[in-house]
UniProtKB/Swiss-Prot annotation:
Pathway: Purine metabolism; IMP biosynthesis via de novo pathway; 5-amino-1-(5-phospho-D-ribosyl)imidazole from N(2)-formyl-N(1)-(5-phospho-D-ribosyl)glycinamide: step 2/2. It holds the Pfam family AIRS. PANTHER family: TRIFUNCTIONAL PURINE BIOSYNTHETIC PROTEIN ADENOSINE-3, TRIFUNCTIONAL PURINE BIOSYNTHETIC PROTEIN ADENOSINE-3-RELATED. This is Phosphoribosylformylglycinamidine cyclo-ligase. Belongs to the AIR synthase family. Its main location: cytoplasm. One of its GO terms (molecular function) is phosphoribosylformylglycinamidine cyclo-ligase activity. It catalyses: 2-formamido-N(1)-(5-O-phospho-beta-D-ribosyl)acetamidine + ATP = 5-amino-1-(5-phospho-beta-D-ribosyl)imidazole + ADP + phosphate + H(+). The lineage of its organism: Bacteria, Bacillati, Cyanobacteriota, Cyanophyceae, Synechococcales.
Length: 344
């Protein structure tokens, strides 16, 4: 008996590494030393930082992977993996520096895994960070054949004098919402139950979704907000006081995270139109309003906190960067998130 007959194909693993090499090395910033194949990735700190702070974050894609694997759509979840990590670490004003991935699978499918890594590389390129390394673990008997799980790790850097920690936020500051691309990567355990209970065909056009299929709408990759945040930070006379990445828990659980004690986020639910995808899910699944607000982003993927004097310039940067943004509320004295509709 050999290793291959036990379910681990080392040669397929080598071919996989060669297949992804070009995509991975294309993401490398000037600070990266060496290429693939070392025991560890090497990366210098960017020059010109007075007191550099490293910011680290880790995350996964959750059960969105189940839907992606069922549909054979693997590229987008690679982007999702980077977005879930990078969108978190940039909330303190940090610039993503490098990314590491971990892929665990029952049996290595070089084609599917290459799609995933190409998606990860695309996400890294969009975020301006290097895909510095990764691990692909073939674990027969632990994971079913054809199934895989993903974990990502992002390290960013910020100069301590430019750290955004929310401590300068004050009553009267405005909340600038940045649109999401859809469900992003949270709430898919509920999504999958809704699809299963209603026997929704995944690849069939849905009128309620503007002609897109459920697979197309639900597997739309998470938006990467790093290019926008970088553009905002480079804008003269624009002051960013806080940021929130709207993930699991929705607006009610993520908006308070950057706020100092004694301040609340007063939102205006009438300031935006909830995307059709969320109406469709709510109707199909008879989802209570509270669960909707505490599970999904409802069309807002990222929120900026800034003084009113910076709003117009910030909105111009948002739109010039290809994103959609609007004022969705303000900071008031209080606690948590205020202004939620009845039942939320």
């Amino acid at each position: 008996m050999d290793y291959k007959s036990a379910g681990v194909d080392v040669e397929a693993g080598r071919h996989f590494v060669e297949r992804i090499r070009t995509s991975v090395e294309a993401t490398h910033r000037p600070e990266v030393l060496g290429g693939l194949g070392g025991f560890g990735g090497l990366c210098r700190l960017p020059a010109g930082l007075e007191k550099p702070l490293l910011v680290a974050g880790t995350d996964g894609v959750g059960t969105k992977l189940e839907l992606a694997q069922e549909c054979g759509r693997h590229h987008g979840v690679g982007i999702d993996l980077v977005a879930m990590c990078a969108n978190d670490v940039i909330t303190c004003g940090a610039e993503p520096l490098f990314f590491l991935d971990y892929i665990a699978t029952g049996k290595l499918s070089p084609a599917a895994m290459a799609e995933v890594v190409e998606g990860i590389a695309s996400g890294c390129s969009q975020s301006g960070c290097s895909l510095l390394g990764g691990e692909t673990a073939e674990m027969p008997g632990f994971y079913p054949a054809g199934r895989y799980d993903l974990a990502g790790f992002c390290v960013a850097v910020v100069d301590e004098p430019r750290l955004i920690d929310g401590q300068t936020i004050q009553a009267g500051d405005q909340l600038l919402a940045i649109a999401s691309s859809g469900v992003h990567s949270n709430g898919f355990s509920l999504v999958r139950r809704i699809l299963e209970a209603n026997q929704v065909p995944l690849e069939t056009s849905q009128a309620a979704l503007g002609g897109r299929s459920a697979a197309e709408a639900l597997l739309e990759p998470t938006l990467l907000y790093a290019p926008l945040v970088k553009a905002l930070l480079q804008s003269p006379e624009l002051e960013l006081r806080g940021m929130a990445h709207i993930t699991g828990g929705g607006l009610p659980e993520n908006l308070p995270r950057p706020l100092p004690q004694g301040l609340a986020a007063q939102i205006d639910p009438g300031s935006w139109q909830r995307p059709a995808l969320f109406h469709w899910l709510q109707e199909l699944g008879s989802v209570p309003e509270r669960d909707l607000w505490h599970t999904f982003n409802l069309g807002i993927g990222y929120v900026l906190v800034l003084p009113e004097s910076s709003c117009q310039q910030a909105l111009e940067v948002v739109h010039n960067s290809g994103f959609t943004g609007w004022i969705c509320g303000e900071i008031v004295v209080g606690q948590g998130v205020l202004g939620l509709p009845a039942g939320a």
